[in-house]
Amino acid sequence: PIEKHHHEVATAGQNEIACQFNTLVKKADEIQVYKYVVHNVAHAYGQTATFMPKPLVGDNGSGMHCHQSISKDGVNIFAGDKYAGLSEEALYYIGGIIKHARAINAFRNASTNSYKRLS
């Protein structure tokens, strides 16, 4: 389900579409369906849709950011009384992401175009 959408700062008709959260596997399936629908609707209108991070040289890139949260028994375990209002679990979670950032790049930034967006 879509929560909201808006035109992005860049040119060439870039848009941001915010989707509602779901469990990891369900959200992965929903994203695949979403991309399939967007590609086919664009094609039906003689247009092209791309999800490339940097489709145009010299223009702003796009990214697919993902918000992450973990709950236990309906309670957000990231909320707490440590640094920045976070829990100890959240701080360890962030530390794990930082520690393994290079390995995470293998699937998070899977193409050369992902890095062009950062430059």
UniProtKB/Swiss-Prot annotation:
Binding site for Mg(2+) 2: 8, 16
Pfam families per UniProt: Gln-synt_C (PF00120)
Protein name: Glutamine synthetase
Keyword Phosphoprotein found: no
Function statement: Involved in nitrogen metabolism via ammonium assimilation. Catalyzes the ATP-dependent biosynthesis of glutamine from glutamate and ammonia.
Molecular-function GO term, any one: ATP binding
Subunit structure, as described in the record: Oligomer of 12 subunits arranged in the form of two hexagons.
Annotated residues for binding of L-glutamate: 60-61, 117
GO biological process assignments: glutamine biosynthetic process; nitrogen utilization
Organism: Trichodesmium thiebautii
The keyword Ion transport is annotated on this UniProt entry: no
Gene3D superfamilies: Glutamine synthetase/guanido kinase, catalytic domain (3.30.590.10)
Lineage: Bacteria, Bacillati, Cyanobacteriota, Cyanophyceae, Oscillatoriophycideae
PANTHER family cross-referenced by the UniProt entry: GLUTAMINE SYNTHETASE (PTHR43407:SF2)
Gene name, Swiss-Prot/TrEMBL: glnA
Spans traversing the lipid bilayer: none
Activity regulation remarks: The activity of this enzyme could be controlled by adenylation under conditions of abundant glutamine.
Domain GS catalytic: 1-119
Protein location: Cytoplasm
